[in-house]
């Protein structure tokens, strides 16, 4: 998806950036799940 390439171009592929990106994707996934439930 476009989100990954966007993050890669805007974030240095360091361990910290990768962790932040994974955390963001995880939170986004949880948000979409909640939206589906409601």
Swiss-Prot record:
Principal location listed in the UniProt entry: secreted
Domain of life of the organism encoding this protein: Eukaryota
Signal peptide: none
Keyword Cell wall biogenesis/degradation: no
Keywords: Secreted, Toxin
Tissue localization of expression: Expressed by the venom duct.
Cellular component per GO, a single term: extracellular region
Bridged cysteine pairs (disulfide): none
Cellular compartments annotated: Secreted
Claim: Secreted is one of the keywords in the record: yes
Example GO molecular function: toxin activity
Family label: Belongs to the turripeptide family.
Additional remark text: Turritoxin GpIAa was only sequenced until Lys-33.
The name this protein goes by in its record: Turripeptide GpIAa
Species of origin: Cryptogemma periscelida
Taxonomic classification: Eukaryota, Metazoa, Spiralia, Lophotrochozoa, Mollusca
